[in-house]
């Protein structure tokens, strides 16, 4: 299992200069990693922004054996502006969000992960919508694995219905809680190891 930190996340570089954040750079970074590692037969998956990155890779021609798009719904891929707007509001108003609000919770998460607000704002400028007609061309097995109470990025069931071989797999939790539950990892494992798909 290879789990890279996306640009501006985790241990990856967090440059501030906008020149380092062209459209679709997160997908392009992953193509470069695949090329660097010489991978030719692989599965591909991602959670939330990682799921959006996977969709962009598919839109740009990547064809892994199987795919997991997790923590993501149809609107989070086809209309990225809404989610980008939410995070732009969070990042541009740090310390000013009402306690318990979605923006407050997002800011708290950023603090616990050591997120760099300037670099993360730049990431929002890299987002590219994946139109529904493009999603309908993703003709390979795709597990849409999402928390049963997660609507942060739109409808996971609508996404699964849009994909020719999409399958909705629900796990307990919402966008922030599902990612830390064992059920998510088990659902990903089971989908990738399932025979006959």
Each PLM stretch: what is its role?
Residues 6-10, 74, 174-177:
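Alpha/beta-hydrolase active-site loop signature
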Residues 52-95:
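Flexible "cap/lid" loop of the alpha/beta hydrolase fold
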Residues 169-197:
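Catalytic active-site module of serine/aspartate enzymes centered on a nucleophile-bearing elbow/loop
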